[in-house]
Amino acid sequence: MPKSRQHWGSPLVHQRLNAVLAVLISFALITIAAPAWAALPQGNAVKDPAAILRDALPFDQDDIRELQHRLELTSDDLRAKRWTALGKTVSRTESLLNTRRDTILNAVPEAKRGTAEALFERVDQGLEDLKEKVKATDKPGFIADRRRTLSFIGDVEALLVPEGFEREIPAEFDALPRLQGRATLNISTTQGELTTVVDGYNAPLTAGAF
């Protein structure tokens, strides 16, 4: 994933930057295509930026989406400390992966399949770690392991994005810069470091402006 670094010095610029980033995120979410929104789990609003980025990936493979959403939707049980329910969800997620693994792998381009297999091994370990955290009723540990496991699932999902995928842009915007894909921006300010992801899959012109 390409990276760029920019520098701003004053607190006023830092405040304006935060406003720009908020607009970017809002614009990116508004411009997500209907199929991406359809993949979002129903019920509670999705607020985790990492989950939103996973859901916005343009690919068509329902099994790994279900795997992702099952883990993401453990938040309510975790807040209520319903450890028995959490244990059942993790076990069912593990069973789902075992039965759908080959189907998911077959959807990954052959050249990337070895990478996907290695990532699934990490997901396997992550699910084992989650079961241990459930047994220990370790809430902070469960959150950390879930975040890491979902990150590996997201990496597999990124491999499912069609090669050369580009969002169609009207011809009148041909002169504008655009980003097809995603980029991570590391931004240094007097208030500290900021890291943000700009999503060219769904808002290529907004992302290209950075």
Residue map of PLM features:
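N-terminal secretory signal peptides that target proteins for export/translocation
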Residues: 1-14
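Sec-dependent N-terminal signal peptides
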Residues: 14-27
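Boundary of Sec targeting at the N-terminus
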Residues: 39-40
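Start-of-domain signal
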Residues: 18, 43-67, 73, 80-89, ...
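N-terminal signal peptide c-region/cleavage motif recognized by signal peptidases
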Residues: 33-34
